[in-house]
A protein has these predicted regions:
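Gly/Pro-rich turn-and-neighbor structural signature
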Residues: 6-18, 23, 81, 87-93, ...
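Feature activates predominantly on carbohydrate-active enzymes
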Residues: 1-138
């Protein structure tokens, strides 16, 4: 039994009295969920012990989704240190869709691609290039994003947009200016929105995570307008 480590008490009979009438209100927040973050060693060891693999399977995620739904949630960022949710087992994404769970991704996993997918696929897909850079490898990165969107387009999702560096790092070198960073992020998001319109639909829900240094790019300064003043993301979710 996996229900927050609480084993239900067994009873021979259960009586529901007619006087008991509880109607739960509809949640006021549209997207409600959690991120399985920094999953090693706790989540990973549990997955290995109970399901035989550090790479979570649909059999494992069924319990996670059930827990999420019992908590009145509907949205998840899957584990991504040692696993790639859709690439390892696409059945994970299909199961989430079947159970009514909306799948997103963290601040550095845009366009339905898990954090480790590029490191894995660039070894076998030369069309993606080898550098995680929208300055030197924009064409390859765009193909990588496009294929992720096409793979997951029929599953309900909240698509993360934006871009950070590999392994949860800064995207640009340390000597890059605020304007440099804002401009490359704008270029990446513009391309992502074009791909989303082509592969899914333009009005599909999208999220930009304002995390760490991205907050500086969002705010800008007195000399450099930030992303908060950019009309292209005006209708998107800012987190």
């Amino acid at each position: 039994v996996f229900w927050a480590d609480a084993v239900p008490e067994k009873r021979e009979t259960i009586v529901f009295d007619q006087s008991i009438e509880t109607i739960s209100k509809e949640p006021s927040v549209r997207y409600r969920g959690f991120f399985i973050n920094d999953e090693q060693p706790c989540f990973g060891n549990w997955a290995k012990e109970k399901f035989g693999s550090f790479k979570p399977t649909p059999e494992l995620y069924e319990h996670i989704f059930e827990l999420l739904l019992r908590l009145k949630g509907n949205y998840i960022w899957p584990a991504m240190w040692r696993s790639d949710f859709s690439m390892d087992h696409f059945e994970n994404a299909l199961l989430a869709d079947e159970m009514g769970v909306i799948v997103g991704a963290s601040h550095h996993e845009p366009c339905c691609r898990s954090g480790g997918e590029f490191q894995t696929l660039r070894k076998t897909h030369p069309e993606y290039g080898t550098e995680w850079s929208f300055l030197s490898n924009a064409e390859g990165i765009s193909r990588f994003w496009r294929d992720g969107l096409l793979r997951n387009k029929d599953c309900e999702s909240l698509i993360t947009i934006g871009m950070r560096g590999e392994f949860d790092s800064y995207l640009m070198p340390e000597d890059a200016t605020l304007e440099d960073n804002i401009n490359v992020l704008k270029a990446a998001i513009t391309e992502q929105k074009k791909l989303i319109a082509e592969c899914v639909e333009a009005k599909h829900p999208q999220l930009l995570a304002i995390y760490k240094e991205v907050e500086d790019y969002y705010q800008g300064d007195e000399n450099t307008p930030g992303l908060k003043d950019w009309d292209l993301i005006r209708d998107d979710i800012m987190m």
